[in-house]
Amino acid sequence: MNHSIVIGVLAALSGSLAWTLSSSLWRSIKTSLTAWQLNGLKIVIATLFLCPVLLFLPWSEQTNGLMLLMASGAIGIALGDSFYFAALRRQGTRRTLTIEALGPLLASFYGMTFLAEIINLKSWLGAILVATSVVIAAFQQPPENGVGFNRQFSSQRLGLLFALSGVICGVSGAALSRQVLLLGQITPLQSAAIRLLGGLVLIIPWLSKCAY
């Protein structure tokens, strides 16, 4: 197997594991912060952590690519993650992560449509399984002993809408960043830092105004 493919698979699995653990951790935190505010706090902390990377970015040489990455962060991190946190609050980790599994499916459609990528039979079978699991999860009710769940139909429907919006924003943001990364002039770490900055620019002005 190609070495780069192995690295890509390991990175994807590590990212999924990190998302699952962080989602469970967030569900266990008792807080009055809204999803937008919590995401803003997360972005601020992460941006400060990667601040040294931002200082050495090739701003003058890669202006277009960096602006594209900032737009990617605004869509995928500021909007997408806020929708994701809002869905977690209403539906819980299991249902939200199941719907989140639509992400690779939508990304595959994007690659096939705009990047002329070829989707093999195994990938299509996997896509069908994912779509089926999402449909099943969408019609399930949260467990009776689920702490903090709102079992009302309106809340569950809103949670489903938030989860789907999070997937769409996440895939859209990833698609924008992938166009830049394919050029090979900006490293993944630099890409993560500039995307966080883009998310920060969008989310900060609305921290006290967004109530979901």
Please describe what each predicted stretch is:
Residues S4-A18, T63-I77, L121-T132, T187-V201:
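Structural signature of hydrophobic alpha-helical transmembrane segments
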Residues M1-H3, L55-L68, A116-L121, G146-F149, ...:
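Membrane-interface helix termini and inter-helical loops of multi-pass transporters
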Residues I7-G15, L41, L50-L54, S60-F83, ...:
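Loop-to-transmembrane-helix transition segments
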Residues L50, F109-L115, K122-P142:
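Hydrophobic transmembrane alpha-helices of multi-pass small-molecule transport proteins
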Residues M1-Q37, L48, F149-Q190:
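Glycine-/small-residue-enriched transmembrane alpha-helix faces in small-molecule transporters
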Residues V44-F49, I99-T113, I128, G198, ...:
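Alpha-helical transmembrane segments of compact multi-pass small-molecule transporters, enriched
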Residues T31-Q37, S82-L102, G184-Q190:
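Structural motif at transmembrane-helix junctions in multi-pass transporters
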Residues L17-T20, C51, A74-A78, P104-F109, ...:
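Hydrophobic/small/kink-forming positions within alpha-helical transmembrane segments
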